[in-house]
Amino acid sequence: MVKRTHGYRYKTRKLLRKKPREKGLSGLSRLLYEYKVGDKVIIDIDSTFISTAPHRRYQGKVGTVVGIRGRAYVIETFLGDKKKIIITTPEHLKPYQGGS
């Protein structure tokens, strides 16, 4: 028997799938949106940009922008009670519209 691999994108077949109407690149407004330090964002992984995508466990998490590194944003979020720092580009972020 062959040993199963447990790579970085393991178990993401349905999670990172795009529906037919969503295929292709995202809109420009998502890429050009400027986040400021302190803004809340939702981590929404875009499967067309592989190299800057966060791990699948952060899909749908809400975090706070704590810094900027070049084009990328430093996001602080929690996994349970642990504070985690994620560095990712705006392709994988959406502004949080909910309460404070």
Curated annotation (Swiss-Prot):
It comes from the Archaea. Keywords: Ribonucleoprotein, Ribosomal protein. InterPro entries: Ribosomal_eL21, Ribosomal_eL21_arc, Ribosomal_eL21_CS, Ribosomal_eL21_sf, Translation_prot_SH3-like_sf. One of its GO terms (cellular component) is cytosolic large ribosomal subunit. GO terms for molecular function: structural constituent of ribosome. The keyword Ribosomal protein applies. One of its GO terms (biological process) is translation. HAMAP family: Ribosomal_eL21 (MF_00369). Belongs to the eukaryotic ribosomal protein eL21 family. This is Large ribosomal subunit protein eL21. It comes from Pyrobaculum aerophilum (strain ATCC 51768 / DSM 7523 / JCM 9630 / CIP 104966 / NBRC 100827 / IM2).
